[in-house]
Amino acid sequence: MSSYKVVIVGGGPVGALAGLYAAQRGFQVEIYEMRDEYSQVQTATAFSAKSISLTLSERGIKALRHSQCRGLAERILSTTVPVYGRMVHSRSKKRLTSRRIAYDVHGQALYAISRSEINQSLLEELSAFPNVHIFYKHRLNGLDMKQKCATFHNISRPQEPSHETKFDLLIGADGAHSTTRFFLSRYAKININQKWEDIFWCELTIPAGHALPMDCLHMWPQRDFMLFACPDKEGTLTCNLFAPENVFLELKSSGRIVEFFEKNFPGITPDLIPTDNLQKQFKSNLHHPMIDIRCSPYHYQDSCVLIGDAAHAMVPFYGQGMNTGFEDVRILFEDFLDQRRSFPSWKDNLSLSYAMQQKELPDTPQAIVEDYLEQYTKYRQPDVHIINELALQNYRELRQGVFKMSYHIRKHIEEFLSLHAPQLGWATQYRLVAFETMRYTDVLRQVRKQGLILSAVAWSCLLLFFLLCLLSLRL
């Protein structure tokens, strides 16, 4: 068992997975969580806005499988609902229409799961490790990066003094409103770009017994807003209304909630949600704003590193928030922190790259940990900034793109090439993001390259058609 001590702030899914990675490596692990034991697996708090249904995709599944916890990924997947595409609902000529759009031509699926379900599975896995200690109802009150000392206060016992704990590495996994990030900014020159998007959301529930298919996500898109429904294993559908703030304010002031849903989301009420229940849910459930956070760097020396929403909070429209956080954990440990366990070979591995950069090779484990955390920031930041942007773009695509002919033409061409000419390596952007684990920077590079090729082919065909028309006129 190693004496290296890792303190993790935040016991949500990303923090819990980081705890598993650290525990499997024999580190002494302490996890501090502000909420009650398992309260986060029972309900979302009013301020947390964590109740949006989650989807596991390949990046997250790979991180679970690489945790070295036998059968963990399979146990979690057994509690999910596989979804193979979207079903777009609309009204055409006064008739309700539904169109299924598969995510992937190869039949791959996303896996819908509640935040509470996956959090509980990870916390239960952690409880089996003797080198892991979890402290609930503890808030981070202070952080001394120089002395590597954190101060926590038990908020269930406010009369008791705060207690200090030493660490070798502190991992901040405490979400978008990260206290770790706040204290880190006192030491590191962190650039933080925080933007409240004009996107509010409200959760609604479609009771079990409905006739909607459970193997897809359901959408009712409009130009400026949309309704989204995700299946739960209990047979219900968790819905989220996404709209600008002015839409919510208008609905609250006018009270015309039923009329709004009947006009814009055909088939919802009274067929799926009784009108009185719809009004009750809309009025009683909170209306949350959405935030986009991007920061850099993610670390300070060899003392602290941010992961998950603490480093990069994104809107949920690509379903990659948790998956990206899980991928943070895998990359941080496998590609960087694991190297500290073999200091001499680590120095050997670094020698060539340092010689090429004409830099002096660090001569202590602490200096090398600091260097690799710096490299982690440089490696990871471009990727997560891209997925933050892609998530925002996908909100526009979900509302408007699904009705555009150009969207479906490109999708069909790319899927045809992916299926019938796999040697070309062609794939849709969605497949590269959700069903592959290539870097997001490489995803964007490939998608742009494919777009340029398709544009060149389209313009060439148009030019050829024009020339043939001219030739036929002369003849």
Swiss-Prot record:
Its cofactor is FAD. It is found in: Mitochondrion outer membrane. Belongs to the aromatic-ring hydroxylase family. KMO subfamily. One of its GO terms (molecular function) is kynurenine 3-monooxygenase activity. This is Kynurenine 3-monooxygenase 1. Catalyzes the hydroxylation of L-kynurenine (L-Kyn) to form 3-hydroxy-L-kynurenine (L-3OHKyn). Required for synthesis of quinolinic acid. It comes from Aspergillus niger (strain ATCC MYA-4892 / CBS 513.88 / FGSC A1513). It catalyses: L-kynurenine + NADPH + O2 + H(+) = 3-hydroxy-L-kynurenine + NADP(+) + H2O. GO terms for biological process: 'de novo' NAD biosynthetic process from L-tryptophan; anthranilate metabolic process; kynurenine metabolic process; L-tryptophan catabolic process; quinolinate biosynthetic process. Its main location: mitochondrion. Keywords: FAD, Flavoprotein, Membrane, Mitochondrion, Mitochondrion outer membrane, Monooxygenase, NADP, Oxidoreductase, Pyridine nucleotide biosynthesis. Its EC number is 1.14.13.9. GO terms for cellular component: mitochondrial outer membrane. Pathway: Cofactor biosynthesis; NAD(+) biosynthesis; quinolinate from L-kynurenine: step 1/3. It holds the Pfam family FAD_binding_3.
